[in-house]
Curated annotation (Swiss-Prot):
Residues 711-775 form the HMA domain. SUPFAM superfamilies: L domain-like, P-loop containing nucleoside triphosphate hydrolases. It comes from Solanum demissum. One of its GO terms (biological process) is plant-type hypersensitive response. Residues 16-39 form a coiled coil. GO terms for molecular function: ADP binding; ATP binding; metal ion binding. It holds the Pfam family WH_DRP. It comes from the Eukaryota. This protein is encoded by the haplotype A genome of the allohexaploid Solanum demissum. Belongs to the disease resistance NB-LRR family. This is Putative late blight resistance protein homolog R1A-3. ATP binds at residues 50-57. Keywords: ATP-binding, Coiled coil, Cytoplasm, Hypersensitive response, Membrane, Nucleotide-binding, Plant defense. InterPro entries: Disease_R_plants, HMA_dom, LRR_dom_sf, NB-ARC, P-loop_NTPase, WH-like_DNA-bd_sf.
Amino acid sequence: MKTVIARTSSKLARTPRMNEEIVGFEDVIENLRKKLLSETKGQDVISIHGMPGLGKTTLANRLYSDRSVVSQFDICAQCCVSQVYSYKDLLLSLLRDAIGDESGSRELPDNELADMLRKTLLPRRYLILVDDVWDNSAWDDLRGCFPDVNNRSRIILTTRHHEVAKYASVHSDPLHLRMFYEDESWKLLEKKVFGEQSCSPLLKDVGLRIAKLCGKLPLSIVFVAGTLSEMEKEVECWEQMANNLGGPKLSSFLEDRVIDISRLIRLWISESFIKSSEGRSLEDIAEGYLENLIGRNLVMVTQRADSDGMVKACRLHDVLLDFCKKRAAEENFLLCIKRDQSTKAVISHKQQAHLAFSKMDNLVEWSASSSLVGSVIFKSYDPYFARCPLSSHAFALSHILINFKFLKVLDLEHQVVIDFNPTEHFYLRYLSAHIDQNSIPSSISNLWNLETLILKRTPAGRLNTLLLPSTIWDMVKLRHLHIPNFRAESEDALLENSAKLYDLETLSTTYFSSVEKAELMLRKTPNLRKLICEVQFLEYPNQYHVLNFPVRLEMLKLYRFNNSKVIPFYISAPNLKYLKLSGFYLDSHYLSETADHLKHLEVLKLYRVEFGDHGEWKVSNGMFPQLKILKLNYVCLMKWIVADDAFPNLEQLVLRGCKDLMEIPFCFMDILSLKYIELDNCNKSVVKSAKDIEEAQVEDNQNTNFKLVIIKKMILQFDISHDKEIDNAFKRLASLPGVDSISIDMIEKKLTVGGDMNANEVRLVVGKLIDSGML
């Protein structure tokens, strides 16, 4: 007989607040309401998951108390599980709602209470709210009490953990509750402070700023609104609040605005946080850890790749970030050095394991007294460097490193230009910095423990090919090598006799000058998973050559600048999932022949590719069997012939700037997996064919998930260095006639401006903003 589960509590399960007002999430509520009232006969569990403070419970309660929903059910009952709970109390809470009284049931054993609840629900259509479920076992304890007799009964379940939501789901997919939009943040703040009244126009600007500083989290907004409600409704008071929010509490949410996933994983590995497991790479294990944190909503995803949906960037909520920083300080793990913080002020902390600096001068000052520090991270952009000539702020790396005897990580990711002259730092595993030189000294091999080498280049430096010494092939522990436009300076015979870099997984962006050199380098890197390279072959053979890429290669990007040329080889990569070709001339048979060697390809992107044979591309039956995403950007393609059985699993088709193409093949009407077509700056005949495909997909195939997006406006992209004055830059750009969208991607360092605008005027203004150091 089951009496009490391992998690027990003497108090009744917490009852959610029923009258809490909710503002925002209107689209989410409508979507969930439809699921609750759908015609699906079987029992369905509507799972809502997300990080603490998003308003999962409030949202669930709004649905649970919605008259249009409740009126469709015979019985409504709820319970709140929490991390520590009593199984008996949960059953009593549900029985109290189901039968109106549970006073005579408290003395019954748990199994009889569960049976009573099940029999009460059995003949009726019920709506159950199970709030705050922490693990699968808690759901297992309750699910047997909810019978499924095909009468459209529904269960709303809230949890912080994605795995729990997925585990409990039946028909409907779990809903990951998003952060607030900016307008929702303001509406909630205004509602909480002013009630039914409107905010004074004098306070609106600062109010909008305060709402933005709350980090799009409803809980933070409610907390701040409570404080504002008790303050004078004066601009000065609200300005003070805004300034306070810019301090160490809520502003820490924005301290590291986004965390680049690739960088994070490389740092984890360099710090030895990831333990090896037979048959799995360290990168795969690290990705598993990250997915676990995301699934538990401890880490928020801020950006996914538009190609495959993989996480590209994330962030920590301010509460969790503050907790991590405090624990790190308590355990002597991390010390963040502020701009004006001297070594004297925190002398007792000099032997921290990791130091994070926001000013380069601090690093120079601290280097003399931090010999045991293992990691140094320069974590923010210093405007000083934007105002000075590059040569005036190049730091001699050797002078800094000589004092950090046991340094494992040196991450100067922002624009700190260093004089790269490596010394014998045997422990260094991770190095990221900017350089202003065209060659690397052979002494780089002294860093024989190095696993990650990222050398970004100044705008002037990018114009020249960077020469790497032959000693680079002696660095057998390298896992990730990222240097724009580089080539190895070595004789073929020397390279042939060098060691293989078995651990190297990512290589970008190397420069291949011949097929033979490409073959030789690929033989020396047998375990590559990601390769980005420029192809500038001097000779182009009359006959195609099959170039065998490493078996584990999953991502390949091949570029050619200047005039389009034929790729002198077919690509053979049995496990390749992602392929991007840019700046090449392809005859009509090239992709067909290559496709035979790419059976697992899921993403294909062609950028400024010119199709030969009168601009024709033929795709035969059965080609690209696993392809999900196809993007054609500014390709010279006039006639596209696709067999009926090609692209059988295609989900997305994107055409941008394909001015010569006359139509999308009609066989796309019959691709049942197709979900999305996007057209940008294409011919009217292409638009018409896309609309015909949309009609066939939606009406004939009943593909309700299909979406057609037609973009008519102009899009301009610019390379930028930073976004520290982005608000002022946005205001300047937004004032230009025709500009209706501005976005920034600091992972890719790209500014995008869109609208029906004067392109030359926009380019002129952006150029001035960059020159002035605002971008």
